[in-house]
Amino acid sequence: MSAVTVNDDGLVLRLYIQPKASRDSIVGLHGDEVKVAITAPPVDGQANSHLVKFLGKQFRVAKSQVVIEKGELGRHKQIKIINPQQIPPEIAALIN
């Protein structure tokens, strides 16, 4: 499975998360996943909620349209973006 998959209702992203980074950013490929750096620490779900908020802004969707499908408690996550309004250039470059 590739890092970015296009479905009928949106995108599925396989992510590797780097918490407690100096700034929020989509770094690029990390193996067969997309590396995303976020500033929030991995404590009490702070990193997950921060990730959902960050991806919502990047894809211009509501937070409810960003769904963590797998990896709630780990660094490796599978995220579904429902009907993205915009696709960041870092992700667009990975879509086949």
Swiss-Prot record:
GO cellular component: cytoplasm
Disulfide cysteine pairs (residue numbers): none
Pfam family for this entry, one: DUF167
HAMAP family: UPF0235
Family the UniProt entry places it in: Belongs to the UPF0235 family.
NCBIfam families, A to Z: DUF167 family protein, PRK05090.1
UniProt name for this protein: UPF0235 protein YggU
